[in-house]
Amino acid sequence: MSIVMRILLLTACAFFTASIEARHVVNFNSGWEFSPDGWEGVPRKLSIPHDFQMEMPWKKEAGGNRGFKPMGAAWYRNSFVTDSAWGDERVFLDFEGIMCIGDVWINGEKVASTEYGYLGFEVDVTKKIKPAGGTNTVEVWASTGDQWGSRWYTGGGLYRPVRIKTRPVRSIARHGIFVSTPDVSAVSATVRVQLELDGFRFDKSFWGTSNSANNVALTSRVEAVAIVFGPDGRRISEVRGDVPMMDYRKRTEFALSDMVVQNPELWDINSPKLHMVEVQLVKDGTVIDSDRLRFGIRKIEFSPEFGFRLNGRKVFLKSMSNHSDYGAVGVAQFDRAIERTLRQMRSFGFNAVRCSHNPYSESFYRLADELGLLVVDEFVDKWPEGTYLWSGRKPFLSMWPELMTEWIRRDRNHPCVILWSLGNELQQSERFSGYDTGDWGVTTYRMMDIFAKRLDPTRKTTVGLFPTRAGAIYLKDPRYRKKPLLPPELATVMDVASFNYRYEDYPDYLASNPNMILFQSEASTSKWLEPYFAMDRARTVGVSWWGAIEYWGESNRWPKKGWNYSFFSHSLEPRPQAYLIKSGLLPEEPLTRIGVVEDSGERLVWNDIHSGQYLLSESWNPGGKEARDVFVFSNAEEVELLLNGCSLGKKKTRFNVAKWDGVAYIPGRLEAKGSNGSAHFVETTGDAVGLEIVEESPGEWRADGEDLKYLRVYATDAQGRRVPNVSNVLRVSVEGSASVLALDNGDHFTDDMFCVSEKRMHKGFALVILRAGLEAGDVRVTLSADGIAQSIAVLTSK
């Protein structure tokens, strides 16, 4: 938050005659003890976020769906001292997520459980903690559940932040502020604030009463005040309203009068302006509680005529769909890991993310707000009747209202969120489609849709659909191609019809259901840009490539540890195909890129879709085939390929692709030139003699014990050119207040672990991930490899 904003908020709080102490929020991420075997052994000290499953060895027998990692459970333990400053406030332990299931004890008493690791919870421990000055012990048991509780790698443990929070007995509830902007134009915008309050039932000692002519009247008045601050910190609007006293309800819900903001600065993908609202509860001139949050003023619209509009302008979603691991750190939700991923996607032209298939961490949505990314926010994968693909100890169908309440109330103030997705690929089996009503999820969807709109009436809902026809007719069924092609039953009742794959069938679907709003919620990476160019982008919402980044789990064979038909490796190194996608998503930037075929790759049918990926490189070194196929990716209409200055011909591009088959290998320089002035070359290098270190986010490294620093390392020859065929062992040593969190090389097939200080480079590449300590200062990193000169980087944490 800016200094200007802090000053203005303090001024706002001081507007009234008095105020109570502010809410307290204590970071509870450090000082944990960890033991995978209970407390009989010697526990290990660590800080969270932490993914204990990523530290377990790869095991073939563990199965590919969870990334060949064994299932397991572990214990965490920490302590805190009851602070006298908390006074009479209620005290909560706030867990943003325990993967996959977990239980919580405080001072030896079990106080909470969670059945869905992708959503958080809080537990009121006010009556469980010791008096001021006393030490309280918190213990957490976390389990991955059994192997088939999930289809992908989930990780395990305290993988998201934990906090201690306090708030007054009479207060704004958890996620109790809801800000919406029902009317938005360039001239003015309506801002609506709805509140949920706790503790405002009748209490004579609080409200007071007077008797007059046999009537009882309250002598105290409680006001709710909402103050809106602009992106620059200026106070731009305010509204007040009386808090109603509810005789019997634990929670009070009401809306304040609408505010009007003149000439609003809108949140947009190209200019993500964020406002702030502060809500104060004021009793007789004294602020008794306050809370604040960021929001965006923006208008979203969906229609079969134009797909999606943001602030009145057509926007086509250029999206990725991925599970929420971050490579070598597993599912541990470090802000920096999330940010580097989103920034990388943004730089390659993506403007949206479909969360798959679960809510992401709170930091993800905050960063998406800041970076101007659109989000399709997804609730769960399936709606199962039993425990298959559900890790919870309680049935999903008994829990979804509670879980949906937490999910939507948590995320509804983020302007990045434009659509609620309630599930994914339910028509694979009726046991995944919710209640046993025989309609492939239609009844269950309608129930969930009503419930979702009770919590947030401003957004539409959808479900990602498996590529079957109505009646769950699969690809192998002879009726699959029989006309008319009828979409799955759910597609005809949803607000937005989200289809995974099969974009070529959309015209047939529209012929029978012309009012459907279409979104290609998953597209095959093996088809490259075809799903993007072949769609009617003027009338559809967007396209989202499945598995744009490598992820752990959903592997079809050992020793491949996960999905790898991707544009980016799990270390976020872009493959040549990534530049192809960029050339399409950012046509205003002339781009040409070479991809040399190393292997045609495997081909398989996955989810009734033909999948696979060429193994491409940017290497022109000896050791490969004597005749090599070469792709040229370009947003030029025509490209020319040259070898050592001699033209190999010109070709027109189709979907930004041209291909030369059987190019004879001759050492030297292979160059591609586009008719739009763009060019790219690869060339034969010398032997590796040095190491190039590329620091990501230079100058940005907080000494808070949680921030990460990424160093990309490349083997180079005497001319400084990167050498792609190097596999020397790289060794890392660190001096200063930091430690090696992980050492990666981008190899999705290796059995090596990440929590090491030495590892073989893979194709001349390695990635060093450092975790900051708590002391600011210089950190010296020394990298060495046999036969290669060492390299040193001096970094500074602040």
Regions found by a protein language model. Name each.
Residues H24-V42, M71, I98, Q147-W148, ...:
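Substrate-binding clefts and catalytic carboxylate motifs of secreted carbohydrate-active enzymes
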Residues V26-F28, S35-D37, R66, M71-R174, ...:
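Accessory beta-strand-rich segments of carbohydrate-active enzymes
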Residues F28, P49, P57, G64-N65, ...:
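An acidic-aromatic loop/edge-strand motif
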Residues M54-T82, W86-F95, M99-N107, A112-E115, ...:
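Active-site-adjacent substrate/metal-binding segments within catalytic domains
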Residues L119-E122, Y248-V261, R654-K659, T750-L767:
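Aromatic sugar-binding surface patches on proteins
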Residues K130-G133, Q194-S303, W660, I666-P667, ...:
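Extended acidic/polar, glycine-enriched regions
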Residues V193-L197, E278-Q280, H610-L616, V630-F633, ...:
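Beta-strand-rich structural segments
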Residues F206-S210, N214-V225, N270-H275, A627-D629, ...:
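Short flexible loop/turn segments that cap and initiate beta-strands
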